[in-house]
UniProtKB/Swiss-Prot annotation:
Protein name according to UniProt: SUMO-activating enzyme subunit 1A
UniProt gene name: SAE1A
Lineage: Eukaryota, Viridiplantae, Streptophyta, Embryophyta, Tracheophyta
Species for this entry: Arabidopsis thaliana
Cited function: The dimeric enzyme acts as an E1 ligase for SUMO1 and SUMO2. It mediates ATP-dependent activation of SUMO proteins and formation of a thioester with a conserved cysteine residue on SAE2. Functionally redundant with its paralog SAE1B.
Single biological process term from Gene Ontology: protein sumoylation
Major site of localization recorded for this protein: nucleus
Amino acid sequence: MDGEELTEQETALYDRQIRVWGANAQRRLTKAHILVSGIKGTVAEFCKNIVLAGVGSVTLMDDRLANMEALNANFLIPPDENVYSGKTVAEICSDSLKDFNPMVRVSVEKGDLSMLGTDFFEQFDVVVIGYGSRATKKYVNEKCRKLKKRVAFYTVDCRDSCGEIFVDLQDYKYTKKKLEEMVECELNFPSFQEAISVPWKPIPRRTAKLYFAMRVIEVFEESEGRKHGECSLLDLARVLEIKKQLCEANSVSESHIPDILLERLITGTTEFPPVCAIVGGILAQEVIKAVSGKGDPLKNFFYYDGEDGKGVMEDISDSFTS
């Protein structure tokens, strides 16, 4: 991603942000290739932010046909059926993003992520999955980890007014300012599979309840063959049954996961634009840090709950069991 120097046009366009994070960081951004799959409200906010930041290219994957339902919280889809009729979500969002910053190459890739081989992911520096199944997240993360080069991997999921971000930067080196000098730092990230397989009992009780609740919902959707968000209040009994099974298997009290939180997650299928903006903005910030190699990255989960307006970072790894 080091590549050549910024062009005169790039320097002029990105002048303000260059003053914030420096020309070298901007140069890395303009050479970064990012794959984004699953474009709903939060991911739309993320895409807007990274396109405005001036990444090299963004490849979008979302074969859903654009319709009134897809319009929910996704400002990249114009509320005009004459514009979006017959087009996929990725195609419509691609057109909108090109208007934000013509210097960023925005393209569309069709197909199913879970059917793509390792070689496909090699062309990217960052992979972001929005609203994918647990199986898809595991599959893509595994493919990224098999590559010779390091590909930063992220997932994001917003339900009701709650949001989750997962980060896997593998073995990551970066610099940060300490006192008056820049110091070299290194972090080791667990894979998605490793992070969600950590036994619950050793995890501190103060850990965000959303971490556990999201795992319950993932297991429910997978075991019932549901797509992301295909649940309602009618499913609450089954969700609570799975919660009980997981708590017993992990030797923790069922109070670890409040029933009311699970109810919110399965009934709140509509995204909240303010939450989309917050979580999508944080995700964009983390990707920019990872690409530029400057600043402490998020390790490895982030949770936001619009009910109390609090965001927390949780480091979930096998360090709890060692």
